[in-house]
Amino acid sequence: MANMQGLVERLERAVSRLESLSAESHRPPGNCGEVNGVIAGVAPSVEAFDKLMDSMVAEFLKNSRILAGDVETHAEMVHSAFQAQRAFLLMASQYQQPHENDVAALLKPISEKIQEIQTFRERNRGSNMFNHLSAVSESIPALGWIAVSPKPGPYVKEMNDAATFYTNRVLKDYKHSDLRHVDWVKSYLNIWSELQAYIKEHHTTGLTWSKTGPVASTVSAFSVLSSGPGLPPPPPPLPPPGPPPLFENEGKKEESSPSRSALFAQLNQGEAITKGLRHVTDDQKTYKNPSLRAQGGQTQSPTKSHTPSPTSPKSYPSQKHAPVLELEGKKWRVEYQEDRNDLVISETELKQVAYIFKCEKSTIQIKGKVNSIIIDNCKKLGLVFDNVVGIVEVINSQDIQIQVMGRVPTISINKTEGCHIYLSEDALDCEIVSAKSSEMNILIPQDGDYREFPIPEQFKTAWDGSKLITEPAEIMA
């Protein structure tokens, strides 16, 4: 009889839920009601972002799937990052601007997606699509525009410019051989162009928050971020769940009924249930035994033993990589070399390039003539080479010394602290291009020795009545 009564009550609850769901499904699409002070529905700014995803992002994803491999995998990550941004914009359209202390936590889902994209590039430096991965990795921080004020649009443009450095390389390699890569470049750059236009129309001076909803917080906002309608890319929100999940849950409750019946049987014993308890003596009581209190202070809570797991993915930077010195296609890869001063590349060809990555306290000699040399993320590295027909680039490095034995037309220094370049007599017409770097010196041969000339790091700019005039600031020793 009791089981029958319980079944009737469950059926009544199920019917009640079905009626409420049916009533909600017939509401007008523009206004889906109000929950906890938040009016559901999609704001015009979110709808506009959905159009961007359905057009530009979808086109980029399609072209990436055509190229497949690492490019496709990377593009899926980009798509996921845009989904996270869409969820954040949905939250902003329903909640007021959060307190400053909550901003970092609310931005964490997007920042983690950006980090994932950049990490993928770092882990696949040997990929033959490395320029594609670099274009995405260098520009994906543009999604951080939601935290930029008062001019988020120019920030996105700056990130777009960072991408063009690598997309130009892609175009150079494939514009005459495989137009699929050209389409890929166009579709990717179009994303950021359209995002700038979107920001200009809906968030000109910074992210626009709701004026009427409750204040966003790590509690209330995450309920929106984790809800079904806010995450998928298509514009229309998903309808409320139908009856099948309801009865699935009921079925799961029935599966657990034996254990629940056993629990009720124990409870029905009343005071007799205490007969199974064991008597605790004074030496087993913490408040009467000082030694137990000392042990208790050292005992960790079992619930805390699982907390380190979320941080475990961050352990990968400490991995020890095997040193690499090999020719892969037309690229010489010199990676993860430490305390090596005997590295020599002698069998070179004009079309080959050398890529030197994450090398420390080492010296590398490249003989013959190569197309270009790139030094990336290196420390205390010495490079000696004969001839380069293209460019020598130094990026994100520290304490680099370069000696030119023959000729090189251009040397580029970017985001580097400490770079000393020894030019030969034949390389005095070399052009040095530098940006965001310091402690740069050019050493010119004179009378059998070298004379050092610092590259300016400080500039002064003045208005001459018609244009800006910029020149190095003279610093007298």
Curated annotation (Swiss-Prot):
This is Adenylyl cyclase-associated protein 2. It is a peripheral membrane protein. Residues 317-455 form the C-CAP/cofactor C-like domain. Keywords: Acetylation, Cardiomyopathy, Cell membrane, Disease variant, Membrane, Phosphoprotein. It is found in: Cell membrane. Belongs to the CAP family. One of its GO terms (biological process) is cAMP-mediated signaling. GO terms for cellular component: cytoplasm; plasma membrane; postsynaptic density. Residues 230-246 have a biased composition (Pro residues). Residues 225-261, 274-321 are annotated as: Disordered. InterPro entries: Adenylate_cyclase-assoc_CAP, Adenylate_cyclase-assoc_CAP_C, Adenylate_cyclase-assoc_CAP_N, C-CAP_CF_C-like, CAP/MinC_C, CAP_C_sf, CAP_CS_C, CAP_CS_N. It is linked to Cardiomyopathy, dilated, 2I: A form of dilated cardiomyopathy, a disorder characterized by ventricular dilation and impaired systolic function, resulting in congestive heart failure and arrhythmia. Patients are at risk of premature death. CMD2I is an autosomal recessive, severe form characterized by onset in infancy or childhood. SMART domains: CARP (SM00673). It comes from Homo sapiens. Involved in the regulation of actin polymerization. Transmembrane segments: none annotated. Pfam families: CAP_C (PF08603), CAP_N (PF21938), CAP_N-CM (PF01213). Residues 298-320 have a biased composition (Low complexity). It comes from the Eukaryota. Signal peptide: none annotated. The modification N-acetylalanine is found at residue 2. The keyword Membrane applies. The modification Phosphoserine is found at residues 301, 309. Its main location: membrane.
